[in-house]
């Protein structure tokens, strides 16, 4: 019985920064879960969808350059890419000068799938826009950029947006 009372007290003393951390985690997980459900008819995971969209916007890319633009992967995306190659969505083109290097491009099927993912993303964003309708979005974005500044995912997203640093993103 004493434990239940202690747990109630613990919930009352959660620090605001701790609450923020868990809210960010919960929002990310819920968003990922909802997006995964939306992608299910395409038989793609959110990570695979991200690879397709990054290639759609930036192809051709080396495996290393792709990895530098992904938020879903902090290491090499080789396994992720391999699955997309096996599904006929991505093509690996060997370098003529360095056999260790490959260039990644979308196949015709991959371009079609990336377009489908883009349409699903638009529907997803529209369906969830009401959640942030009256929120101070510019301030929230500024805070989140500060939160990821200098971290691999923040750096990858800044690169993907065509900015060298998160600071350039914050200045907008």
Q: What residues fall within each predicted segment?
A:
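C-terminal regulatory/oligomerization modules of transcriptional regulators
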Residues: 1-12, 134-172
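N-terminal leader segment of winged-helix/HTH proteins
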Residues: 1-42, 89, 169-172
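Short amphipathic alpha-helical segments with heptad-repeat character
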Residues: 21, 25, 29, 71, ...
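N-terminal helix-turn-helix DNA-binding core of bacterial DNA-binding proteins
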Residues: 25, 29-74, 87
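Charged, amphipathic alpha-helical coiled-coil/dimerization segments
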Residues: 32, 82-142
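Residues within helix-turn-helix
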Residues: 63-64, 75, 82, 102
């Amino acid at each position: 019985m004493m434990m239940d009372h202690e747990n109630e007290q613990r919930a009352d003393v959660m620090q605001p920064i701790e609450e923020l951390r868990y809210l960010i985690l919960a929002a990310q997980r819920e968003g990922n879960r909802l997006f995964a459900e939306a992608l299910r008819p395409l038989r793609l995971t959110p990570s695979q969808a991200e690879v397709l969209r990054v290639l759609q916007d930036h192809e051709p890319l080396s495996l290393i350059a792709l990895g530098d633009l992904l938020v879903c992967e902090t290491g090499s995306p080789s396994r992720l890419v391999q699955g997309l190659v096996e599904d006929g969505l991505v093509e690996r083109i060997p370098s003529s000068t360095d056999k260790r290097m490959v260039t990644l491009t979308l196949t015709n099927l991959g371009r079609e799938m990336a377009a489908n993912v883009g349409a699903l993303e638009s529907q997803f964003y529209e369906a969830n826009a009401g959640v942030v309708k009256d929120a101070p979005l510019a301030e929230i974005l500024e805070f989140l950029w500060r939160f990821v500044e200098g971290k691999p995912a923040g750096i990858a997203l800044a690169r993907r947006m065509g900015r060298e640093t998160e600071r350039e993103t914050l200045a907008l």
